[in-house]
């Protein structure tokens, strides 16, 4: 058992939404990267409907951190208990609770509690963890509150879709993945990418800033964190700085082989920024138009990238 001092924090917010809606967003951890600004990606490793084990990636004080978390959901009391089973230093232990309480008048009190210890309990390390917990907790509560309070038209704000390209049977799937992985080369390979800066301080964790061109020639700057799984042929990402029309944007590149060839797939999930619709698309524009615009713009660029990945793999076979 740890001998370090236990540090405790509590953050709460009142949400103008039913308690069931708020609890549902907390319970759906796999979609947290779409709901919570700090969260990059969540992999569900195992679950029985109540107990679950999750691998999580999130930003903390400007760094990308990863850990495994065990959670116990209790829909009856609207509480979710969590414990990091493999915390990343300087964290030694991390436990906590999400508590959802129905208030008179139909609003909800959402409380997030953390108990943690720090290796060696050095003041600078304790300060680092406290700042990360405080910053992320505030961002998570604010993001959830903002989304939950628009629950009546949640389905209009959120959209998910995918595009795919079939690759020839003789083209190695590894070359398709290689093209998608080597994003630092994209400015000289992909016409709609005019600038891309990429760092990979930890293997498979890429941080990048990119300028892309739209069909009308306008440039958009985005920043992203990408988590790469080469053995599974997957690259997942979260945009940490999005275009004006998008509140949040997550996605995945995947390369899947079968007996007759390879399919390269691009998946997107987006939360629209409702108050930017008319500013971006013009007076009178609505969410339906915004959905079409985002679907077309993201789909066009993704498909172009997939086609170039296909050509990269197939041309290597021809030239070989």
Predicted regions and their residues:
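Hydrophobic ligand-binding cavity/cleft-lining segments
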Residues: 1-50, 130, 138-202
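Glycine-rich portal/gate segments that line the openings of hydrophobic small-molecule binding cavities
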Residues: 2, 30-34, 41-95, 184-188, ...
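Generic structural detector for well-ordered beta-strands
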Residues: 12-14, 72, 99, 166-168, ...
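Short, tandemly repeated low-complexity microdomains enriched for cysteine and small residues
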Residues: 35, 43-47, 112-113, 121-127, ...
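A broad, low-specificity signal marking well-ordered, structured residues that form hydrophobic/aromatic
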Residues: 80, 98, 163, 167, ...
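N-terminal membrane-insertion helices
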Residues: 133-141, 145, 298-302, 306
